[in-house]
Amino acid sequence: SAWGHDFRTDYQALVILKRRFELVPLLALTATATSQVQRDIKEMLGLRLCETFRGSVDRKNLFYEVLEKASTLPEACQQVHNWINDSFRMGGVTGPGISNSLGTTPCGLVYCFSKKETEQVCEELRRLGISAMYYHADLEHQDRSKVYELWCSGKIRVIVCTVAFGMGIDKANVRFVVHFTMAKSIENYYQ
């Protein structure tokens, strides 16, 4: 599966607990894992006799929009800038159940394929007036933490990132996720 090799090492180590304390119950939760990923998780955690409960991945509060991307990076960044500003100038991104009723500034993520692209897109969005910072695996831990804290506190509006950012994020005023580059798999869109 897509998570097989890069599955968080801390989670992979949980199998040690299962082996050492066989009678202690273990619960694995995921919001978007495919059947194959679920099988991988069960195998990695040593869960042989277990119950699986699934809900629908159809989220009524999400909508998808596909736009043709401009051919140059500056033009594509201008498109993202315009889309973000146009969407929120009208009181919120259009779509079922999406609003800014929390009274906080809407924020979001712009996913890029490479670390280099995150830096280039971030620089261009900042030049266009969007408060943004980039996030990727080559940043020092303290720098990644700082970006996350600034975003969570509302001091920056957009994180331009690779897939190194995103899993486990729970921020109430996230109103958009832009894939600047096509995701590798449909799983990445759900994440």
Residue ranges, per PLM feature:
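Helicase motor core with emphasis on the C-terminal RecA-like subdomain
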Residues: 1-191
